[in-house]
Swiss-Prot record:
Disulphide bonds in the chain: none
Subunit structure, as described in the record: Interacts with STX1A, STX2 and STX3. Interacts with STX11.
UniProt similarity note: Belongs to the STXBP/unc-18/SEC1 family.
Protein name: Syntaxin-binding protein 2
UniProtKB keywords: Exocytosis, Protein transport, Transport
Pfam family, any one: Sec1
Phylogenetic lineage: Eukaryota, Metazoa, Chordata, Craniata, Vertebrata
Domain of life: Eukaryota
Role: Involved in intracellular vesicle trafficking and vesicle fusion with membranes. Contributes to the granule exocytosis machinery through interaction with soluble N-ethylmaleimide-sensitive factor attachment protein receptor (SNARE) proteins that regulate membrane fusion. Regulates cytotoxic granule exocytosis in natural killer (NK) cells.
PANTHER family according to UniProt: VESICLE PROTEIN SORTING-ASSOCIATED
Entry annotated with the keyword Glycoprotein: no
GO BP annotations, alphabetical order: exocytosis; protein transport
Length: 118
């Protein structure tokens, strides 16, 4: 049965269009979000649903995080200067980047000048 209600539809879109779109069997990922994205996700998805899709940890992009260079990260961000700069900073690390790879999704269309910074 298809999801009904706006929250259910948005939740399914996040699970299928973001998380499942990069999911590989037997491989865990880290989910990194900014505050607006976290509010969207927490209003329409249960943490158990997210963990069942192979997400091992959910973190705030604006808080200090330990590097996990063995795992790929899914970034679900608002298209803001602050969030894009935090994403860029994750891959400026020396000697290794914060994560193995980045799968980047924005909650709305990212303006061309901001996108070109990536």
């Amino acid at each position: 049965m298809a999801p009904s209600g706006l929250k259910a539809v948005v939740g399914e879109k996040i699970l299928s269009g973001v998380i499942r779109s990069v999911k590989k069997d037997g491989e865990w990922k880290v989910l990194i979000m900014d505050h607006p994205s976290m509010r969207i996700l927490s209003s329409c998805c249960k943490m158990s649903d997210i963990l069942a899709e192979g997400i091992t940890i959910v973190e705030d992009i604006n808080k200090r995080r330990e590097p996990i260079p063995s795992l790929e990260a899914i970034y679900l961000l608002s298209p803001t200067e602050k969030s894009v700069q935090a994403l860029i900073x994750d891959f400026r690390g020396x000697p290794t980047x914060t994560y193995k790879a980045a799968h980047v999704f924005f909650t709305x269309t990212c303006p061309x000048p901001l996108f070109s910074e990536l």
